[in-house]
Amino acid sequence: MNRTSTLLSCLILKYERVKAPQKKQVVVLILLFIASGTRAQFYKDMSVGINGGIYVYQGDLTPDPMGSFKTIKPGLSLFAKKPINYFLAARLHMSFASLQGDDSRYSKPDYRQQRNFYFYSPLMEFSGQLVWNIRGRNYDDYGIQPYVFTGAGVSFIRVNKNYSRMNTAYFGETSDVYTGLVADNAHGTPRALLSVPVGVGAEYPLSERFSLNIETSYRFIFTDYLDGFSQAANQKLKDHYHSTAIGLIYKFGVKKKGLGCPSVN
């Protein structure tokens, strides 16, 4: 007989043995026990975590198709995860970071040093995710546990763009860059973006309660104005960003202990 059913049996036996005036008190105790048991069951196997890592902007202000590793920024994430079954878990994720892109950091192609676009934005994101434990070990506390995940969320940004360093003589006022800037300024910059995170990671249990985790996540954000530039740069390609982080996870749960109440046959 498990801990919950044993305690409940004790309370029921007490209810049957006490006098009528005291039965109301026992009923209240039973109801409180059921409520606390429901809450404990909800938190059972739930885990929370914190990790830190790097955020990489991928867009018009870098020639590298993998993103601007010359302007990486730090970030911090908090999350809570609850297993649904052995393979699947639901996760709430919140991150605080920043993104940056800078043409001047690249000497090739030559025009980047002349265009000299720059942007910076703080970033705050919230997402709900589904996490697939590849080995089906959501309830285990041993062995490496690789996983993949995806979900949907919102990324809040505040774009600060700068084109004051541009060599206008190099491009000319009739160039596509100059006319594109006029259009981009008229368009403005977004403050909130729909994001779809897709990533992979792994957990390594250190004990019954603690685990290390490392993961990388790519965000699809469906806009070309993450950096504030589109028609003045490359409007055919959307902007994105990705992150890689390492952190620590704490798993809730109550160890089974003796209760001092005899079991009921």
What is each of the regions a protein language model found here?
Residues 44, 70-74, 122-126, 144, ...:
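Residues that define the transmembrane beta-barrel architecture of outer-membrane proteins
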Residues 204-265:
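Predominantly the C-terminal beta-signal and adjacent terminal strand-loop region
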Residues 82-172, 247-250:
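Gram-negative (and chloroplast) outer-membrane scaffold detector with strong preference
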